[in-house]
Amino acid sequence: MANAEHLALLRAGASGWNAWRAWRDTTPDLSRASLRGVDLSGFDLSRTDLRGADLRGANLSGTNLSAAHLEGANLFKAVLDGADLAGAYLYGAQFLNCAQLVVTRNWQSAFRDEALACGASIPK
């Protein structure tokens, strides 16, 4: 379950969230959070626990999702253009497809299911 403090910081906006992330060495917990349709563009969500989060229709353009845990997250119609997926965990991500994946950065290094090979090898 998402940490209420982390969720409140996220809802306050990218500048406050990113400043908090710059000063805190923590793993934000947004697991199973309802973030449907939320504009998360430009957020630093690196190393964030987003397992099972509802990200349907969320704008994740330019978001840093490196090493984020997105296992089981619902990404139906999520916008991922330019998001950084270096080392992200995408196993079991729902409604994610190659068309969404290939417009991101560093997607080839993301840990993902065979269905999301998208012509590139999958890291072990």
Segments predicted by a language model, with ranges:
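Tandem repeat scaffolds
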Residues: A4-A8, A12-K124
